[in-house]
Amino acid sequence: MKLVLLRHGESEWNKENLFTGWMDVDLSETGKAEAASAGITLKQKGYDFDVCYTSYLKRAIHTLNLALDEMDRVWLPVVKSWKLNERHYGTLQGLNKSETAERYGEEQVKIWRRSYDIAPPLLKEEDERNPRFQEQYRQEKCEILPLGESLKDTIARVVPYYNEVILKDMMAGKRVLIAAHGNSLRALMKYLEDMSPEDILNVNLPTGIPLVYELDEEGKFISKEYLGDAEYVKAKIEKVSAQGKVTIE
């Protein structure tokens, strides 16, 4: 069986090289084009779906909607969950990645962005960026909403949701598309491929390019494939990798 993952298109804050996390930032014009292109590619390659999953954040929701529009599938059922939200970047949210690297060092920023079990500095309870103050989460228990997360923390919410909800749909024969975020999808990739914490450190997921997983009947990993020109995909991955490095003017 197949599972298709789609990282949202470039957001306004991706474009400005800012830490985004749970901040509800919309797609840039480039991101909208990437999302539409993903839908065109999926349609051309003959992919179809029975149910889609996404987060509570508009950049992922809009990416999914734009892709489905190109596929003539806007009527498909869509399940939204904060469990698929981006990793929460704590106090780093809104900061420029290059400027943060210049201040704290590239290695520290790489650890914050790509390490397995080290969280960035947490938000204070009274911070206006605390999810408890956001309308999307008004039905959620405040104590389960994060103030900052490591990738390990992100995995702790993504993987149970995948196993308890998404995988059940797949095992029932449903074709699934997940439109989410760089780190929530990396969390899932680590689980699906049984990667070590060291290996996941160097995984970079490009925006707006469908990633297809082939799984066996028990949901175990067989193979994966990006749907796109190999050189284009490589360039997009390198662009993501370059974020968080000091920019020399």
From Swiss-Prot:
Q: In which pathway does it act?
A: Carbohydrate degradation; glycolysis; pyruvate from D-glyceraldehyde 3-phosphate: step 3/5
Sequence positions that bind substrate:
7-14, 20-21, 59, 86-89, 97, 113-114, 182-183
- Molecular-function GO terms, alphabetical: phosphoglycerate mutase activity
Per UniProt, the keywords (alphabetical) are: Gluconeogenesis, Glycolysis, Isomerase
> What are the positions of the active site?
H8 (tele-phosphohistidine intermediate), E86 (proton donor/acceptor)
Q: Name one GO biological process term.
A: glycolytic process
Assigned EC number: 5.4.2.11
Residues flagged as site, Transition state stabilizer: H181
Q: Which InterPro entries match?
A: His_Pase_superF_clade-1 (IPR013078), His_PPase_superfam (IPR029033), PG/BPGM_mutase_AS (IPR001345), Phosphogly_mut1 (IPR005952)
Which transformation does this protein catalyse, written as a reaction? (2R)-2-phosphoglycerate = (2R)-3-phosphoglycerate
In terms of SUPFAM superfamilies, this protein maps to: Phosphoglycerate mutase-like (SSF53254)
Q: Say if the entry is tagged with keyword Cytoplasm.
A: no
Which Pfam families did the record assign?
His_Phos_1
Q: Which family does it belong to?
A: Belongs to the phosphoglycerate mutase family. BPG-dependent PGAM subfamily.
Q: What does this protein do?
A: Catalyzes the interconversion of 2-phosphoglycerate and 3-phosphoglycerate.
What is the protein name stated in its UniProt record? 2,3-bisphosphoglycerate-dependent phosphoglycerate mutase
- Species whose genome carries this gene: Lachnoclostridium phytofermentans (strain ATCC 700394 / DSM 18823 / ISDg) (Clostridium phytofermentans)
State the gene name recorded for this protein.
Answer: gpmA
